[in-house]
A protein has these predicted regions:
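Charged catalytic carboxylate motif
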Residues: 20, 24, 47, 51, ...
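Conserved short strand/loop->alpha-helix "switch" segment adjacent to the catalytic nucleotide/phosphoryl-transfer site
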Residues: 29-53
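Short, structured helix-loop boundary elements
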Residues: 18, 41-45, 105
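Long, low-complexity, intrinsically disordered polar/charged segments
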Residues: 21-32, 85, 128
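Short, well-structured hydrophobic secondary-structure segments
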Residues: 51, 56, 60-61
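A generic alpha-helix structural signal
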Residues: 22-25, 56, 112
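Conserved beta-strand-loop-beta-strand hairpin that lines the nucleotide-binding pocket
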Residues: 1-12, 60-136
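Short beta-to-alpha transition helix within the HATPase_c
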Residues: 7-27
Length: 136
């Protein structure tokens, strides 16, 4: 069995954390190329970075204190996990194009094969799993 490629980073939640998380994720995706024998397709890479942005934005917006992001790759999928200090799970809204705001998790759920959120000691953990090569 192949060991997953992992990267974990802790953020303060201050200005610049979202850009730093995207940069970390972009570098992580670049590091996948040797394991995959090809880079992550451009459109899919952008979708992965969008999911990172949405999860990290929510952590910074709704949780006091620092948060941590872990990226892993195994079995053709990237898993993005964000831990934060709020025990409040993300709300699930019905799609509504007239609603202002609250679309982040809706976008994440649409792009990902699986999204889970659970309370853990000291806060919550949200994990999004995306197939790198989108199924036909």
């Amino acid at each position: 069995m192949t060991e997953p490629l992992r990267r974990s980073v802790r953020y303060s939640g201050r200005d610049g954390s979202i850009a730093a998380a995207r940069d970390t994720a972009a570098a992580f995706l670049d590091d996948l190329a040797p394991d995959r024998a090809a880079p992550v397709p451009g459109e899919r890479a952008e979708e992965i970075l969008l999911v990172v942005s949405e999860l990290v934005t929510n952590a910074g917006r709704y949780a006091p204190g620092p948060y941590e992001m872990e990226l892993s790759y195994c079995g053709g999928a990237v898993e993005i996990t964000v831990w934060d200090t709020s025990s409040q799970l993300p709300r699930r809204f019905e799609p509504d194009p007239l609603r202002i705001g609250g679309h982040g998790m809706e976008i994440v759920r649409r792009l990902c094969r699986q999204v889970t959120a659970e309370r853990v000691h000291g806060g919550k953990r949200v994990t999004a799993r995306l197939d790198v090569d989108r199924p036909a």
